[in-house]
From Swiss-Prot:
HAMAP family: DapB. It comes from the Bacteria. The active site is at H167 (proton donor/acceptor), K171 (proton donor). The gene is dapB. Coiled coil: none annotated. This is 4-hydroxy-tetrahydrodipicolinate reductase. CDD domains: DHDPR_N (cd02274). It catalyses: (S)-2,3,4,5-tetrahydrodipicolinate + NAD(+) + H2O = (2S,4S)-4-hydroxy-2,3,4,5-tetrahydrodipicolinate + NADH + H(+); (S)-2,3,4,5-tetrahydrodipicolinate + NADP(+) + H2O = (2S,4S)-4-hydroxy-2,3,4,5-tetrahydrodipicolinate + NADPH + H(+). Keywords: Amino-acid biosynthesis, Cytoplasm, Diaminopimelate biosynthesis, Lysine biosynthesis, NAD, NADP, Oxidoreductase. The keyword Cell inner membrane does not apply. Signal peptide: none annotated. NAD(+) binds at G13, A14, A15, G16, K17, M18, G111, T112, T113. Its main location: cytoplasm.
């Protein structure tokens, strides 16, 4: 570890389940310094972010809902590396959050899913013009990246594939960003999957799931008791090949989050996907 000043970090969505894990991980990383904790929930205003995350000692960083003043404060810190904001908020607010951060020269690391392709392109253009690094990562789990790589390899040999993603019932968007990204990676091969051999009729609309690119179907499940799970199921005459990743604890995302915080400072534009920085 060098003697360089620690990276100043803001966590947006700090009172949420992922936000609390991020606060805890940052507090335990000697090269990172939590300067701000943002959350819109009224019941958490003024509470210490460390105590809320379950740390034994307070961090003396109070939860606030004032994003712009915090961005300005961190941007005004001229000593040490530029600031980073980690966003685990909501699909309705993440786009504006990221634009505001880039405008202040703060590097966004975005774990919130639900951004449309057009929004991602707009943010990419904005980051490019500002020469500011930005990372949008649908899934911070290294295990999920390995699953996606295995799926790309398998899709060269199988012509039929469907994706099932399962999440807790507080997740706001469907399908998950990870499932969409997985389908996009398979579609990049340029082949069409799941050529129909019969004319299908959905007796209930949506029964066959949502249709992604190149004929790939995604099925979404939302239930209490789940965290985050994904299956990629390949089929061929006489065989089924299933890839599955299960998240049992949100701590599995933290190595990817910390890596992204450190890597985003080296970027001058928007990068999409954890696999691009491994």
């Amino acid at each position: 570890m060098t003697n360089q000043a620690p990276i100043p970090v803001i966590v947006n969505g700090a009172a949420g389940k992922m936000g609390r894990e991020v606060v805890k991980a940052i507090a335990q990383a000697p090269d990172l310094n939590l300067l701000g904790a943002i959350d819109s929930s009224p019941e958490h205003q003024g509470k210490d972010a460390g105590e809320l995350a379950g740390l034994s000692e307070p961090l003396e960083v109070p939860i606030t809902n004032q994003l712009e003043p915090m961005l300005g404060y961190v941007a005004g810190e001229r000593q040490g590396p530029p600031g980073v904001i980690v966003d685990f908020t909501h699909p309705d607010s993440v786009y504006d959050n990221v634009r505001s951060a880039i405008a202040y020269g703060i590097r966004p690391v975005v774990g919130t899913t639900g951004l449309s392709p057009a929004q991602i392109q707009n943010l990419a253009d904005f980051a490019e013009k500002a020469s500011t690094g930005c990372l949008i990562i649908p899934n911070f789990s290294i295990g999920m990246v390995l699953l996606q790589q295995a799926a790309v390899t398998a899709s060269q040999y199988f012509d039929h594939v469907e994706i099932i993603e399962l999440h807790h019932n507080q997740k706001a968007d469907a399908p998950s960003g990870t499932a969409i990204q997985t389908a996009e990676l398979l579609a990049e091969l340029g082949k069409t999957f799941n050529s129909a051999i019969v004319e299908e009729t959905e007796k209930i609309p949506g029964a066959r799931g949502s249709l992604a690119g190149e004929g790939i179907r995604i099925h979404s499940v939302r239930l209490p008791g789940l965290i985050a799970h994904q299956e990629v199921i390949f089929g061929a005459p006489g065989q089924i090949y299933t890839l599955r990743h299960d998240t049992s604890d949100r701590a599995c995302y933290m190595p990817g989050v910390l890596l992204a915080i450190r890597k985003v400072l080296q970027l001058k534009s928007l990068v999409y996907g954890l696999e691009k920085i491994l």
